[in-house]
């Protein structure tokens, strides 16, 4: 039997090349522009923060005129739905508490109860001067809370009397940035200091200047500065004496 001279056995080099091609590591594929635009690399924490900042469900706690400015956001002129804000009527379905208006001692326990019923993570926006410091209603009132941060922790302060709808949008954008940079592990460690939950509110006593005495005072300056009363009486006597001398002559 004669072997075919044209049919030769493969060389060792060809066998080696075939083995490397079939058993070797796969080469790095080329990444096209279409592939890079359709793949996003992120972490689970960033994905969780992105989902929360895009769907903030606020609980509206309005007690005074600042709440009217927030009600203007519902209209088509501002359209707060584009931020994913869906107002809720139950604290158990909300993650954002917007306090707008004066908080009194009688309403303080109800506000704290609503905050405690909200699931974590939760955020608070103090809207308006009356909410942040007590405003003009705390000048001579013993029932107004001088700052809602004495009751619940506040994440963002929105000053104004009242703040405009554009300012409310700016506050929401700043809160979204805070949520985006937040860490789940660090959020549970945040605690509030100087928190008072008792009904007898701890606040600094401020003597009121508007106490009705200005109605009995001779001038408005004396009503604000009672120490000037003697000087005013003395100068008034001198003026009367001079006027009598002039009239006699």
Swiss-Prot record:
UniProt-listed InterPro entries: NADH_UbQ_OxRdtase-like_20kDa, NADH_UQ_OxRdtase_20Kd_su
Membrane topology listed for this record: Peripheral membrane protein
GO biological process, one term: photosynthesis, light reaction
Compartments (UniProt record): Cellular thylakoid membrane
Catalysed reactions, semicolon-separated: a plastoquinone + NADH + (n+1) H(+)(in) = a plastoquinol + NAD(+) + n H(+)(out); a plastoquinone + NADPH + (n+1) H(+)(in) = a plastoquinol + NADP(+) + n H(+)(out)
EC number(s) recorded for this UniProt protein: 7.1.1.-
Pfam families reported for this sequence: Oxidored_q6 (PF01058)
Keyword field: 4Fe-4S, Iron, Iron-sulfur, Membrane, Metal-binding, NAD, NADP, Plastoquinone, Quinone, Thylakoid, Translocase, Transport
Source taxon at top rank: Bacteria
ATP-binding keyword on record: no
Entry keyword Mitochondrion: no
The record's free-text note on cofactor binding: Binds 1 [4Fe-4S] cluster.
Gene3D superfamilies, sorted: 3.40.50.12280
Main location: membrane
GO CC term, one of those recorded: plasma membrane-derived thylakoid membrane
GO terms, molecular function: 4 iron, 4 sulfur cluster binding; iron ion binding; NADH dehydrogenase (ubiquinone) activity; quinone binding
Principal EC category: translocase
Cofactor: [4Fe-4S] cluster
PANTHER family: NADH DEHYDROGENASE (PTHR11995), NADH DEHYDROGENASE [UBIQUINONE] IRON-SULFUR PROTEIN 7, MITOCHONDRIAL (PTHR11995:SF14)
Protein purpose: NDH-1 shuttles electrons from an unknown electron donor, via FMN and iron-sulfur (Fe-S) centers, to quinones in the respiratory and/or the photosynthetic chain. The immediate electron acceptor for the enzyme in this species is believed to be plastoquinone. Couples the redox reaction to proton translocation, and thus conserves the redox energy in a proton gradient. Cyanobacterial NDH-1 also plays a role in inorganic carbon-concentration.
Family: Belongs to the complex I 20 kDa subunit family.
Classification via NCBIfam families: nuoB_fam, PRK06411.1
Quaternary structure (record): NDH-1 can be composed of about 15 different subunits; different subcomplexes with different compositions have been identified which probably have different functions.
HAMAP family assigned to the protein according to its UniProt record, in alphabetical order: NDH1_NuoB
Name of protein: NAD(P)H-quinone oxidoreductase subunit K
Originating species: Prochlorococcus marinus (strain NATL2A)
């Amino acid at each position: 039997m004669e072997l075919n001279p044209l049919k030769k056995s493969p060389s060792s080099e060809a066998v080696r090349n075939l083995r490397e091609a079939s058993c070797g590591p796969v080469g790095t594929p080329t990444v096209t522009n279409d592939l890079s635009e359709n793949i996003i690399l992120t972490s689970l924490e960033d994905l969780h923060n992105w989902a929360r900042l895009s769907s903030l469900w606020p609980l509206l706690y309005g007690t005074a005129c600042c709440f009217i400015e927030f009600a203007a956001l519902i209209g088509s002129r501002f359209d707060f739905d584009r931020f994913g804000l869906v107002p809720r009527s139950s604290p158990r379905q909300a993650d954002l508490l917007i306090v707008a208006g004066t908080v009194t001692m009688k309403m303080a326990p109800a506000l704290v109860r609503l905050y405690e019923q909200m699931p974590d993570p939760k955020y608070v926006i103090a809207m308006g001067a009356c909410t942040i410091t007590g405003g003009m209603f705390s000048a001579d009132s013993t029932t107004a809370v001088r700052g809602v941060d004495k009751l619940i922790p506040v994440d963002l302060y929105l000053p104004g009397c009242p703040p405009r709808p554009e300012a409310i949008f700016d506050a929401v954008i700043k809160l979204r940035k805070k949520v985006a940079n937040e860490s789940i592990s660090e959020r549970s460690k945040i605690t509030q200091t100087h928190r008072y939950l008792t009904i007898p509110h701890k606040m600094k006593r401020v003597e009121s200047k508007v106490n009705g005495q200005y109605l009995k005072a001779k001038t408005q300056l004396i009503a604000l500065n009672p120490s000037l009363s003697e000087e005013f009486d003395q100068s008034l006597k001198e003026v009367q004496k001079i006027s009598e001398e002039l009239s006699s002559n």
